[in-house]
Amino acid sequence: MKKLLFVALVVALLASCMRKKCNYNRKIEFISVREWRNAYCPHKGKIYVYKKGEGFTQPIDSTNVYHFEISTHPFMFYKDTTNYSSLVCSVDMIDDLNYLHDVRLVLDDTLYYDVSQPKLSCVEGPWVMGGPTEWSIVSSLYVNGHYYDDPTVERGLPISHKFVRIQRK
């Protein structure tokens, strides 16, 4: 009985030491357009989901965005917090919106953000009773072909407003 208890304890300790892997299947819950330096808040938005690497040709899913919020509170990993402002778009009702797909965000039918190649990284935090805390962050991605490496917490998608593509009707 003691041997069985000892083996169970060793297996439990070894299992708790495994590093978690970043979950690319996790649903994206919000999109944050960073460096949103004006008080204007869009009236409507649309998110399109595309197969990864297909060049934004055939959307596989889409949804409307109805809830926008201008935030002046920086995220945990934001480098420059002076005059911080971002537009946060809450996302729901779309199952295919995850880090395995390319995403296009369209605001007011004129502002286009094509997001591709998101890279998730695991970050270790302070030690607690069970060991170090770990969580995933979006460490880099491409916005309209421009490399962007301002990290944000997982379940979010950071976009820089300076890479916007404007298309007039």
Where are these regions (language model features)?
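Positively charged n-region of N-terminal signal peptides that target proteins for export
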Residues: 1-4
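Bacterial N-terminal signal peptides
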Residues: 7-12
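C-terminal motif of bacterial Sec signal peptides marking the signal peptidase cleavage site
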Residues: 14-16
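Bacterial signal peptide processing site
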Residues: 18-20
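Post-signal peptide N-terminal segment of mature Sec-exported envelope proteins
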Residues: 25-43
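Beta-strand signatures of extracellular beta-sandwich domains
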Residues: 46-48
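Tryptophan-paired
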Residues: 50-111
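Extracytoplasmic electrostatic interaction patches
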Residues: 90-169
